[in-house]
Amino acid sequence: MHRVTITLDDDLMERLDAIIAVRGYQNRSEAIRDLARIGIQQTSAHDSGERCVGAMVYTYDHSKRDLPRKLTQSFHNHHDLSRATMHVHLDHDQCLEVTILDGKASELQHFADHIFSERGVRYGRLVTIPTMDDEQHTHD
C-alpha cells in the first residue's frame, strides 16, 4: 500500500466529509479508496474485455408500437449476457425493468446502449462491477 498526500479545496473536503459521515467510513482513506475504485471502474471498464457483472435499469413506455416485442427480441439475441430480469408496472403505460447481466464489459455496454436507444425507452443506466476471477459458474 502507498501513502499519498492530496490537496482538496474546502468545498470538496466538506462534501467528502459528509459522504464519510453518511456512509459510516472509519476514515478518509477508506472513502477515497472506494471513490478511486468507482472512478477507475466507470472510466475504463465499459470499453474493456474485462469480465464483469452488471445491472441494467431502464424505464419504457410499453404502449409504444412494437417496443415490448423489440425488447424481448433483443434479450433473446443476447441470452448469453442476461441472467435475470425483474419487471415492474409503474403506471398504466410505464414499466421499469432491472436486468442482471454477466459477460465482458464492452459487450454489456453495447447491449445496454442498444436497449437504451430504442424509441420509447425513457431512462437507462448500466452499473457494472468487475469480477475477480475468469471462471464462469454454471449450474449444468
UniProtKB/Swiss-Prot annotation:
Q: Which Pfam families match?
A: NikR_C, RHH_1
State the free-text cofactor note. Answer: Binds 1 nickel ion per subunit.
Q: Which UniProt keywords apply?
A: DNA-binding, Metal-binding, Nickel, Transcription, Transcription regulation
Similarity annotation: Belongs to the transcriptional regulatory CopG/NikR family.
Q: Name one GO biological process term.
A: response to nickel cation
Q: Which NCBIfam families match?
A: nikR, PRK02967.1, PRK04460.1
Cofactor(s) essential for the protein: Ni(2+)
Q: Disulfide connectivity?
A: none
| Molecular function via GO | DNA binding; DNA-binding transcription factor activity; nickel cation binding
Chain sites annotated for binding Ni(2+): 76, 87, 89, 95
Q: Matching InterPro entries, A to Z?
A: Acetolactate_synth/TF_NikR_C (IPR027271), ACT-like_dom_sf (IPR045865), Arc_rbn_hlx_hlx (IPR013321), CopG (IPR002145), CopG/NikR_regulator (IPR050192), Ni_resp_reg_NikR (IPR022988), Nickel_NikR_proteobac (IPR014160), Ribbon_hlx_hlx (IPR010985)
- Output this protein's name: Putative nickel-responsive regulator
Q: Which residues form the signal peptide?
A: none
Top-rank taxon of the source lineage equals: Bacteria
| Primary role | Transcriptional regulator.
